[in-house]
Amino acid sequence: MAPPRNVVKIAVQMSDAIPQLIQLDQAKPLATVLKEVCDAWSLTHPEHYALQFADGHRKYITENNRLEIKNGSILCLSTAPDLKAQQLLGRLQNTSREGCCEVLRNLVLLASDMTFAQEVISRDGLQKLSTIIENGDDLGEMLALGLRAFLELMEHGVVSWETLSISFVRKVISYVNMNLMDASVQPLALRLLESVTLSSPALGQLVKSEVPLDRLLVHLQVMNHQLQTKAMALLTALLQGASPTERKEMLDHLWKKNLRQFIYKNIIHSATPMGDEMAHHLYVLQALTLGLLEPRMRTPLDPYSQEQRDQLQALRQAAFEPEGESLGTGLSADRRRSLCVREFRKLGFSNSNPAQDLERVPPGLLALDNMLYFSRHAPSAYSRFVLENSSREDKHECPFARSSIQLTALLCELLRVGEPCSETAQDFSPMFFSQDHSFHELFCVAIQLLNKTWKEMRATQEDFDKVMQVVREQLARTLALKPTSLELFRTKVNALTYGEVLRLRQTERLHQEGTLAPPILELREKLKPELMGLIRQQRLLRLCEGMLFRKISSRRRQDKLWFCCLSPNHKVLQYGDVEEGAKPPTLESLPEQLPVADIRALLMGKDCPHVREKGSGKQNKDLYELAFSISYDHGEEEAYLNFIAPSKRDFYLWTDGLSALLGSTMGSELTRLDLEQLLTMETKLRLLELENVPIPEQPPPVPPPPTNFNFCYDYSITEP
């Protein structure tokens, strides 16, 4: 007879004792279960004991999480969390240095458990740890363990970072600024200051004023991957918390100190693979640097500004020899004005007053900056562009000014200038760190590409929008390749000619047109079920392989990893925390289990509980696109297992796999593309024998019925 549903078979261990195999009734109070376990081992005072999971992070079992115990779980009997916290904190003050280190190791091991952390915090554990950190009697292992334990406790969000004292923060700052310091201490101190900066504006100002940027640059130059990452994390946190003016001053100082060159040579091109956290911080640094262009992008040209009028005149004079100077100064004001209007027209401005062209925002004054940069840093290319087009047949000239304005707006859109930083994105461009003034240099390449494409298309003024569409495709495709230098970008984008773009479009069109004939459509419909089954099988295999996901803390920072996979029999999801840099764990080592039968539904995007209350700003768009959750039965309540996919592809693979597991439709864009690719391949294989045979749009006509249905059978014929 099968046991009741609320009864699970488990094992309970204790050191120096024979394990117990028991049937745990989940309806029975946990105190009663503990008493029965203690009685079996003749232990008194069951209130001094608690149950923990034997594997993973040894989480304490409470009434809130006891439903996580599944059939086959292995538990261990240990000291109750309140008593354990009291014992450890008592020993922390009354033991030698070696004893304190041992206590701190235990605190670090147990602090990730919320139940234990609350007991430590309620007994002024944070205050005791802060005393160890502030005293700084030992600048080695003991201090590192104290910082780690303090961080683990604070990560639970029970205590606000804003409650930290100024003296404590200053002491941690001193560890960052100290020259001779244990290598394990400074990454932890930097991590703590990053959390303080992101969570408390007031304390963030203290960190900004007392941690010199040059000190962070020193940490970045140390060939220690963890130290580099945490230094970059604090640097981007300080930049995000600064005002626009302060941010510009800070970035100018960093560039003067050759930070860009160091990142390009020693981080991007390092022999050690770049971690996800460093990639995110480089993305943030790139976004903040490009964000300095936003004020110019949002500001229209002021026709009453003498400086801006002089810049326009300098742009004109760089392209044309001032006719008034070559012929003397005898030109009247009207004649000189007429010459200026004509030359501005040759430059490609649509209006007689060029200020009217630059009133559009975006790109505003940023377009003028780009044109001036091109004229000053590539004067021969600039003169050739303008003079070549001013001498072309009417309507075939490529308007430089109009093209520059449109192209600047396009580059701002492709590079997301002025958009808030995503909290999960990692898609920085290595090319950005290979060149000073990368945006303006990119414009110089793009404007010459536009002129080249214009000539290849033999375009007229009426074709301007078509040319811009082709240039957009050329730039977007090349940027997606993430070239590591501007020269490599130039080579790749120039290789993507208008003819190549046409070829790609034609290929795509032929692929589409080849599947529109009714007989082909009918064949595709017959093939779909089999191919969908193949895709379903592949998605489930990806779930069985498992994947590393990042946890998002209360401050939305991704700093911890966990692993999840599907069992080979497709009946259980197994998961658990893993350390950074560790190999993916085996199925047997994962402590947590979620039976597929307990899953209620799959939630995606804004429906997920871990992103539902984060607002609707642009900075959350990427997070919504990568978030999904599983709702499952947790006793009488509904619980959630929350995920943030590393990439859009992984999001599609996992949501498809979970949908297939639950018997739902796999409706992702990736499934549609995979199905289309498989259908195309299978259809071509089926039609190989029909090469050069035209397939009719309609099936052959059905012949008319006979005049009558009076059939005759000759019985004289002997059947064999």
Swiss-Prot record:
Pfam families in the cross-refs: ELMO_ARM, ELMO_CED12, PH_12
Q: Name one GO cellular component term.
A: cytoplasm
Q: Which GO terms describe its molecular function?
A: SH3 domain binding
Compartments where found:
Cytoplasm
A Gene Ontology biological process term: phagocytosis
Assembly state and interactors?
Probably interacts directly with the SH3-domain of DOCK1 via its SH3-binding site. Part of a complex with DOCK1 and RAC1. Interacts with ADGRB3.
Name of this protein = Engulfment and cell motility protein 3
What is the gene name? Answer: Elmo3
